[in-house]
Amino acid sequence: MRTGSYRIPIVTLTGSLQQDLILIDKVLGAGEVALNDHRSSWPSKSEILQLLSDVRVGGMLSGKPGVIHFHMGSSSTKIDLLWQILNETTIPIRHMYLTHMSSRGDELLEEARKWIKAGGVCDFTADEEKLNETKTIDTLNTSLPTYDSFGHLIFYGMSSPELSLKAIQNLVLKYSWPLEEAIQLSISNPATYLNFQQKGFLVENYDADIIVLNQTDLSLLYVIGKGQILKTPTWIKHDIFEHVCEFL
């Protein structure tokens, strides 16, 4: 769980980012804070630095990762402010988590390559191919606003969680990635970076969160959550009142 909002000053639950981290066990950091995006508050370097300082100290005091999830827009300044902070201060790069780095054009994707090489972490939007703004491979679940030619918002929807699996299928079946490498993008990488306890690996005494895929086309066969079977090829477990909602 993250506290915060697109704009700075961010919205918090207790009135303070540090207090949210210390007092609320589920809060791991802040975000998404929008940068270089038409929905952001166009924060200054000092405002971003103050937020990073707060999340670092709050993370240290609470024993949490303390990360800020930055929603990246398509402005020509890209991630220049974050590079400046990284080069001019002692804030570690691990506290800056960049998202949408794959769907804002090839220049931002090149920045992602440099950021990862410097030891940073990015994530990529597993969009449908027609929604990508770059020629790179289909790049996880996100909101999908639609605008007209004048920039007016005409629709706001959400992409399906299954797009994460589709991205993995494409990497393996279309681009010949080894399966054990492709699945890391959605499983072990985020679990390790965000320090999710007992998650991300098939290890004794870890939560038994498992999906079973068809060996040929990687289609979903079984879903197991914390050791409980949730889906088989012929059956899906429903919530106790879910059948009631179908009639509303």
Where are these regions (language model features)?
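Fold-independent oxyanion-binding glycine-rich loops
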Residues: R2-S5, A30-L35, M72-G73, H100-M101, ...
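Short secondary-structure capping/turn micro-motifs that flank functional sites
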Residues: R7-I10, L131-N132, S188
